[in-house]
Amino acid sequence: MTLNLCVLTPNRIVWDSEVKEIILSTNSGQIGVLPNHAPIATSVDIGILRIRLNDQWLTMALMGGFARIGNNEITVLVNDAEKSGDIDPQEAQQTLEIAEAALRKAEGKRQTIEANLALRRARTRVEAINAIS
């Protein structure tokens, strides 16, 4: 038995295919979803989406949004998403270093919050590349 997973951003469809299982980062922690999962709607945190296709795991960096699960269909609507294979490792590492430097230099509450968000996004992209597939 499989699940139909659809990952959408405002600009494009990132994924629309059947999967065996997913592990999704929500604001209250990670959840695993298998076929016949109870229906839920949840917020999606900045984090990794792990996708199992038969015996292979793929990863994707998600930049926050919402997910709806029900009737063996998962719809994930996020601000942005990147498949790990589409992320340039050098660019991701540079972005992480820039985000870390920006956080160190942040002055005031607003700059600190924005720098922390940029750092979380950058870390997520690096984690997606380094995740065990």
UniProtKB/Swiss-Prot annotation:
Location(s), subcellular: Plastid, Chloroplast thylakoid membrane
Membrane-protein topology: Peripheral membrane protein
PANTHER family hit by this protein: ATP SYNTHASE DELTA/EPSILON CHAIN (PTHR13822), ATP SYNTHASE EPSILON CHAIN, CHLOROPLASTIC (PTHR13822:SF10)
GO CC annotations, alphabetized: chloroplast thylakoid membrane; proton-transporting ATP synthase complex
Subunit and partners: F-type ATPases have 2 components, CF(1) - the catalytic core - and CF(0) - the membrane proton channel. CF(1) has five subunits: alpha(3), beta(3), gamma(1), delta(1), epsilon(1). CF(0) has three main subunits: a, b and c.
Family: Belongs to the ATPase epsilon chain family.
Role according to the record: Produces ATP from ADP in the presence of a proton gradient across the membrane.
GO molecular function: ATP binding; proton-transporting ATP synthase activity, rotational mechanism
Main location: plastid
Protein name according to UniProt: ATP synthase epsilon chain, chloroplastic
Species of origin: Lactuca sativa (Garden lettuce)
Lineage: superkingdom: Eukaryota
Alphabetical UniProt keywords: ATP synthesis, CF(1), Chloroplast, Hydrogen ion transport, Ion transport, Membrane, Plastid, Thylakoid, Transport
